[in-house]
Amino acid sequence: DLLLRLLKKYDVDLIEQSTITGAVVENGRCAALITTNNGQERRYEARSFIIATGGVLGEGFAIEPERAWEPIFNIDLPLNPSSPEWSLPEAYPACRQTPGTPRPSHGFALLGPDVDAKLRPLGKDGNPLCGNVFFIGKTLGGYDHAAEKSGNGVALSTALFAAMNA
């Protein structure tokens, strides 16, 4: 309740129960996000955008047999869903241990787009796709929130960091 009051006080739009269906990118910046809710399309313009759409299980990524990608900005993800590394037969595969975690990770659990030091998603050329877009929480790759039991901590710390850089 306190967080929602603070967000309202500082004029922050929190958009829930909507699907982001696209982005309007102009001159290296995101000008707007397009959402759909109950068949209605809406355009949100802002100075900066913090994206917290989730990972594979939260439907933040689109997946087909030969491709996985982040759908808002059409970012290809580094692991092919047809790869044997996508998931292994064992629930807790011994061959892939995430450093510092009590159990190993499946490839899909570590999936996410590459970001720079400010959490901006990178294009194929290694440069930020948009100077004003920041990815946080489970949208980030390289960590297994379930195995590490770090989901809330990563979500909160990356949200604060992104907000400070936005």
Which residues does each PLM region occupy?
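Residues forming the flavin
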Residues: D1-A166
